[in-house]
Amino acid sequence: MTELTRIPLAGVIGSPIAHSRSPALHGYWLKRYGLKGHYIPMDVAQADLRDVLAAMPRMGFVGCNVTIPHKESVIGLADIVTDRAALIGAANTLIFGKDGKIHADNTDGTGFTANLRQNAPAWQPQSGPAVVWGAGGAARAVIAALIEVGVPEIRLANRSRARADALRSDFGAKVHVHDWVQAGNILEDAMTVVNTTSLGMVGKPEFRVPLDALNPKAVVTDLVYAPLRTRLLVEAEAAGCRTVDGLGMLLHQAAPGFERWFGVRPEVDEETRAAVLAT
């Protein structure tokens, strides 16, 4: 075996993939820590997913990140699925074992809580209800994480009521579903507020939920990070809230996979953030 074939490969699979910041992030960490390795973005069509996953270990890949639209599909293709990935119903991190088995995990929830703990140090999730807007895959990861850290109640609103009801049936009595027209009315006394929808993202409709009932003691975070300062965060900051943008979640969710693939737990700090924003 040559030296070249021993260099670990990782990557991110999705479609489209050109927008992903993951290659810049992992490339920065590899350079920062002086590690041998490569991180490669791959545009993979749904029809090719099974064949690509089967081929990657033979090509020297030790694992990969997974993004839209494959996060749910890879659950059924993995040999071993962590409990949290099974609960969420999606995986964003794959590890290719030396035994040939594919291990699937979901680090979105831990990335979410790590981002809040780093950038809102006074955040106390047990101190009051949480409001979550959206009921997609990101919302599932966030709700699982909020339950794990002890949030007493989760008020969920989504533009499709049926999706929110399905999510409640999976996560249990702590989740209370509200119609989307009530999205602003469920803010009273909430201590954590999370937008998991694409509203406010570049190229998407603007976020227009009224925030009059927002608790100024709440921590407000938006998973959207393009733009970094969304309308929600600007208005919440004006109301006196501590606000946290969505870029930190992307950075923190990436760290566990990088450690598994390349053997070093990377720091998520201002230098990391600046390197990703510069791309």
UniProtKB/Swiss-Prot annotation:
Keyword Cell membrane: no
Enzyme class: oxidoreductase
Keyword annotations: Amino-acid biosynthesis, Aromatic amino acid biosynthesis, NADP, Oxidoreductase
Coiled coil ranges: none
InterPro entries given in the database record: Aminoacid_DH-like_N_sf, NAD(P)-bd_dom_sf, SDH_C, Shikimate_DH, Shikimate_DH-bd_N, Shikimate_DH_fam, Shikm_DH/Glu-tRNA_Rdtase
GO biological process: amino acid biosynthetic process; aromatic amino acid family biosynthetic process; chorismate biosynthetic process; shikimate metabolic process
Biological pathway: Metabolic intermediate biosynthesis; chorismate biosynthesis; chorismate from D-erythrose 4-phosphate and phosphoenolpyruvate: step 4/7
Reaction catalysed by this enzyme: shikimate + NADP(+) = 3-dehydroshikimate + NADPH + H(+)
Alphabetical list of SUPFAM superfamilies matching this protein: Aminoacid dehydrogenase-like, N-terminal domain (SSF53223), NAD(P)-binding Rossmann-fold domains (SSF51735)
GO MF annotation terms: NADP binding; shikimate 3-dehydrogenase (NADP+) activity
A Pfam family reported for this protein in Swiss-Prot or TrEMBL: Shikimate_DH
Enzyme Commission number: 1.1.1.25
Cited function: Involved in the biosynthesis of the chorismate, which leads to the biosynthesis of aromatic amino acids. Catalyzes the reversible NADPH linked reduction of 3-dehydroshikimate (DHSA) to yield shikimate (SA).
The protein's assembly and partners: Homodimer.
Family: Belongs to the shikimate dehydrogenase family.
Name of protein: Shikimate dehydrogenase (NADP(+))
